[in-house]
Amino acid sequence: MSKQSSSYHVPVTYIYSVEGNIGSGKSTFVRFLKENLNDPNVVFVQEPVDVWETIKDKNGETILTKFYRSNEDYAFAFQMMAYISRLSILKKTILENPGKTIITERCVETDKNVFAKMLYDSGKIKEVEYQIYLKWFDEFSSYLHVDGTIYIYTTPQKCSDRVQKRNRTGESIPIEYLESCHRYHDAWLNNSNKPLLTLLNEFDVEEHEHMDKLEKFKKFINLNIKQ
């Protein structure tokens, strides 16, 4: 899907973000879309967890492990790292794929409206740190306009079950944290003025059973409209 600017014939890039709680099934859904959409004009961006895992202390412990063990000590550092890595990969993808549609697993707006805000509200990111974070956000994210959001809606308990089942290194997440994430996602997305497609993902199904979600997704982003 691509669009030409009528005045200057400059290709316009569309960005759609797949959102949801930790363990909601975002990564699985994005992989499924990548395998089944079959459109050369659509590019996919996974959450840069692999980049986060390269940030380690001298003992080899990752920032992700440190953050989940001690939110207050590493909240600001982790959120800055998450923001910078997400911004970097999206910027690179946009420059390399002019005029294409980008499907990203989360976006910089998620960091601001869910994770950074939640940590600030709970006192784990200090006032001065939060002001610095917002300065960074306002300065560098203005050109990363998201055109629509796909919300993978899953209850916190189901997310917790999936997190425990996948057992990623360093990912020990209390149910209370997931419940808070759920509330902040709901508050942000349900009050956003951006187009929103909500897909329920409460049940564990095989990937081939996501075909109904694929059809809803295709309709949502108008892949069949020639522009």
What is each PLM-predicted segment?
Residues 29, 33:
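Hydrophobic positions on the alpha1 helix immediately C-terminal to the Walker A/P-loop
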Residues 35-79:
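Conserved substrate/cofactor phosphate-moiety recognition/catalytic segment
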Residues 21:
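P-loop (Walker A) phosphate-binding loop of NTP-binding proteins
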Residues 18:
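Hydrophobic anchor at the beta1->P-loop junction of P-loop NTPases
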Residues 26:
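Conserved lysine of the Walker
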Residues 74-144:
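Glycine-rich phosphate-binding loop used to anchor ATP phosphates in small-molecule kinases
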Residues 3, 160-227:
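NTP-dependent small-molecule kinase module
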Residues 112-183:
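A glycine- and Lys/Arg-enriched "phosphate-lid" helix/loop adjacent to the NTP-binding pocket
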